[in-house]
């Protein structure tokens, strides 16, 4: 797979006191696998061992983040199977169980970002991997007890939200290890590895719980207990803490006062939020709307969305993130209209094909909108203020990543509200159509319209 567009996230920065110290030709560890001197921009340091250390940390980070996304999406696999296991749940309650992990995951993303400089990247990766044991074990217990109250089920589903926070801390940590010339590729690989977890869990878990006689839902949680322990052990043995990394609260403050942060966050709800929301809801939609079709094919949508994200970044590098984002909202609109036609005619081929278009549009838009961020904050900035612009872009990426994830909550709840109020999912899809058209219009008006402040820039 080709490398995605560069996505710099310099949410950690070097402590000036350490930066002034002589930098050794290779990383030197002290107790606790702390590295006091880290200068990836120095070619001698980078060739002398820096690259090897950075790549090792990246590989282990991808695995831990991948597991986080798997656990985050775990309830999307289990919920459609709960009624068959003896649980009496309304469709509204099922969509609550699907939506609440995204609500929690989005909310903890910014705190997770600041945990890395506070505790160290290695230490926090160990802690966050061990935290995955809690939702995995809780799910394994409650799914074997059909008499469990909905409130307890909802609390256990909420615990899975910790997996959604792993993305933020992982990206913040890896952003510090690589030089600017290689940071985009490294972060793209890190993000892609995480996003793939959503599709992989929907592909693998149904097979795991079906091995042998009957359906064993508890295995959906149990299978991740040794995998999470392995992630913690690998991080303990192979990852590093960088003492020169410190939280950059100022970048978040600068970004929060810039209107483009909130415009892009709004757009990111439509791209990344759509990816998470549709990925979570798709198995339940298939189960309830087309019960004659197996839900085991639901994973295809999430994989399409994850694999098309790098494509969106690459195309945006050539044509500009704003143009590609507008095109992606066009795909999302077409997909939603197609899904409406599929529901109205009860045509599974039309419905499934339309959702593949939705996932494709969400994935491409995910990469393209992300690509817009550094371009927006760099536009029209002279060399003297470039460092401030980079800080603002870093803060924007953190904020947009958190806000965008709320789409994973809004989409399932939109489906639930429409079904409960109108007895059909169609009104929710029409609302999504209007939202995508509005997002396309906002992107055009702010970044493409002739006469707009940034129209002359390649955004």
Predicted feature residues:
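Extracytoplasmic gate region of multi-pass secondary transporters
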Residues: 75-80, 258-306, 310, 370, ...
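Glycine-rich segments within core transmembrane alpha-helices of 12-TM secondary carriers
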Residues: 184-206, 397-411
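Helix-loop-helix hairpin linking two adjacent transmembrane segments in secondary transporters
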Residues: 190-240
């Amino acid at each position: 797979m080709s490398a995605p567009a560069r996505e710099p996230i310099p949410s950690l920065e070097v402590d000036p006191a350490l930066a002034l110290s002589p930098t050794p030709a290779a990383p030197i560890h002290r107790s606790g696998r702390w590295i006091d001197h880290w200068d990836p921009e120095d070619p001698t340091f980078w060739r002398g061992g820096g690259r090897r250390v950075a790549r090792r940390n990246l590989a282990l980070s991808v695995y831990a983040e991948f597991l986080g996304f798997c656990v985050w999406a775990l309830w999307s696999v289990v919920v459609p199977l709960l009624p068959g296991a003896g649980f009496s749940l309304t469709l509204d309650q099922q969509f609550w169980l699907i939506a609440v992990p995204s609500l929690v995951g989005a909310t903890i993303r910014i705190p997770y970002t600041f945990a890395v400089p506070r505790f160290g990247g290695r230490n926090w990766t160990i802690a966050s991997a061990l935290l995955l044991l809690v939702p995995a074990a809780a799910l394994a217990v409650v799914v074997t007890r059909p008499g469990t109250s909905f409130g307890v089920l909802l609390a256990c589903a909420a615990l899975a939200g910790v997996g959604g926070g792993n993305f933020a801390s992982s990206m913040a940590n890896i952003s510090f290890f690589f030089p600017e010339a290689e940071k985009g590729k490294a972060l793209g690989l890190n993000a892609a590895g995480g996003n793939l977890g959503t599709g992989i869990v929907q592909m693998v878990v149904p097979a795991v719980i079906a091995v042998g006689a009957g359906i064993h839902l508890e295995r959906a949680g149990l299978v991740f207990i040794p995998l999470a322990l392995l992630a913690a052990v690998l991080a303990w043995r192979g990852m590093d803490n960088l003492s020169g990394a410190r939280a950059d609260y100022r970048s978040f403050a600068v970004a929060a006062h810039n209107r483009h942060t909130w415009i892009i966050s709004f757009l990111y709800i439509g791209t990344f939020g759509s990816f998470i929301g549709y990925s979570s809801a798709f198995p339940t939609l298939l189960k309830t709307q087309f019960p004659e079709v197996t839900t085991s094919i639901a994973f295809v949508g999430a994989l399409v969305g994850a694999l098309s994200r790098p494509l969106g970044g690459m195309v945006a590098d050539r044509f500009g993130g704003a143009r590609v984002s507008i095109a992606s909202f066009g795909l999302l609109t077409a997909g939603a209209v197609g899904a409406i036609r599929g529901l109205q005619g009860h045509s599974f081929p039309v419905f499934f094909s339309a959702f593949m278009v939705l996932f494709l549009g969400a994935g491409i838009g995910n990469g393209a909108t992300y690509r817009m961020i550094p371009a927006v904050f760099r536009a029209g900035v002279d060399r003297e203020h470039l460092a401030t612009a980079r800080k603002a872009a870093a803060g924007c990426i953190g904020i947009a990543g958190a806000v965008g994830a709320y789409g994973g909550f809004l989409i399932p709840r939109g489906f639930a509200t429409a079904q409960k109020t109108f007895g059909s999912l169609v009104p929710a899809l029409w609302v999504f159509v209007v939202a995508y058209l509005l997002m396309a219009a906002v992107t055009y008006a702010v970044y493409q319209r002739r006469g707009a402040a940034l129209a002359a820039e390649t955004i």
